[in-house]
Amino acid sequence: MTIYKIKYIPDIEEDYYLFLNDAIEAGKNYIDKIAMEEKDGWDSATITYAKNCLNDTLEFKGVVKIKAVNVHTHKGELK
């Protein structure tokens, strides 16, 4: 079974999603959050570029990264 790990790089946090689309959507929301928290903010072109990179490569330059992780179950437990 494959799940998707998303790593929020500036915050060093991780979340896991069963579906890739959910992980990408979470990454886009995080990009919006980071863009607003930046001192001068990001312009709309930068935000669009970041989200397109996330869609195409599953990561954006040290901000967010999505990775497929294979997990195996054993007696109802994830390993």
PLM region descriptions:
Residues 23-26:
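Short amphipathic alpha-helices within nucleic acid-binding modules
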Residues 1-13:
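Short aromatic-glycine-(Arg/Gly/Cys) micro-motifs in beta-strand/loop hairpins
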